[in-house]
């Protein structure tokens, strides 16, 4: 690493309120176990005019996952010790069951339970109880890929871990975290507060400077996948604990942050609640977190004993800020990609028959395309006539076929262009046997709308948009968790007579949920 330059970090931080507009936030940089930069700005609550401080607690959301895995390693031991308990937990399973290690590494193939809550009729601002979480997870019978073969983000993995840990130890996760993680690390005010409705020390905001900022409503109860609330000072203490134990081969963070592989031996991007990343040739470990009204991110570079943290009480770019702080501290500069103009033959929708996933491409100008495939849009650089890349995805076009590669997910898809005109004979009621949930499709004035119904309630009506013959998109931009699943892909099946018999409903988080038609 080049000479550490705090002035460049300070200059970047001074402009955060201007470049990332929102109510407030905090950032920090820790080097060699010492705080070299910490800053708070804005307000924890706009109405009460409560300032944001270094000691203001905020939900750290999915950053909690590494702490759940830390408890597993510290209070239980190796993940394999809970494999029998997981088999009993997933007692309705028909496919190959994942192992507990697969849960820790997001290789289980289980569909994300927050995404599935949408299919079960959940109200985005509704109450979600622990019993409902278990009911949803325990009804699962299948995975959307063979465990250990790919990466797919799944909050339910860590919710199940929490349940298994509590059952094994006979203690609450609240108590174990406090005793075995927070106290040794000096995280004085960190606490697992499972009920998001009970946290009122800081307000998270939806919106932006165009629509305005409004307090976000959250009423879910979660544990394992999220739920910890902590201040910047608490998170600094965690980074200092990591640094202080760096030379201990049995140290907790060293065990959490080791390299992981898929079952075929290929390096994996995630392990024990940590993203395993690289920048400027340096290995990073960390995680982001999101809930309606909140965003946060931490990164750690063990080789340089360097950590960055960003926490916002609005839906801004905390992940981008923490990553930029890391790059500035490491002296890594960004390079401009050489681009060519996108040929119109790229544009449109492309379907992978096996997964039911759809890639939608549109021109974004200046040699870029906007791609919709995962939970949020990606900007792709068109690097040649038949190849485009984003940070996580590479696509190559050969006539009417696109090869999509996400190397970090061990995923390679062959996608065909979606053609033809959509028929409107899809209206009716469809049933998922696995979820015991329905999808209702209706036509109003020639427009098609869909609604989900299940044990969590009945959803609003959502408009459907056709992209070709028997392939429709159903956008859902608000859900109990954040970010939302995005576009649900609906791929219909017909019999030999051309009659609709059912469909596959899926998104990146929850692929290929099968429905059969029960009522035209």
UniProtKB/Swiss-Prot annotation:
Active site: 62, 65
Activity as a function of temperature: Optimum temperature is 45 degrees Celsius.
Enzyme class label: hydrolase
GO biological process: proteolysis
A Pfam family recorded for this sequence: Beta-lactamase
Catalytic reaction(s) noted: Release of an N-terminal D-amino acid from a peptide, Xaa-|-Yaa-, in which Xaa is preferably D-Ala, D-Ser or D-Thr. D-amino acid amides and methyl esters also are hydrolyzed, as is glycine amide
InterPro entries tied to this protein: Bact_CellWall_Synth/Modif, Beta-lactam-related, Beta-lactam/transpept-like, D_amino_pept/lipop_sf, DAP, DAP_B_dom
Binding site for substrate: 481
Activity regulation, per record: Inhibited by beta-lactam compounds such as 6-aminopenicillic acid, 7-aminocephalosporanic acid, benzylpenicillin and ampicillin. Inhibited by p-chloromercuribenzoate.
Region entry Important for specificity, spans: 477-487
Disulfide bridge positions per record: none
pH dependence of activity: Optimum pH is 8.5.
Keywords assigned: Aminopeptidase, Hydrolase, Protease
EC numbers on record: 3.4.11.19
Family indicated by similarity: Belongs to the peptidase S12 family.
Function: Hydrolyzes N-terminal residues in D-amino acid-containing peptides.
Subunit structure: Homodimer.
Protein name (database record): D-aminopeptidase
Protein source organism: Brucella anthropi (Ochrobactrum anthropi)
Designated gene of the protein: dap
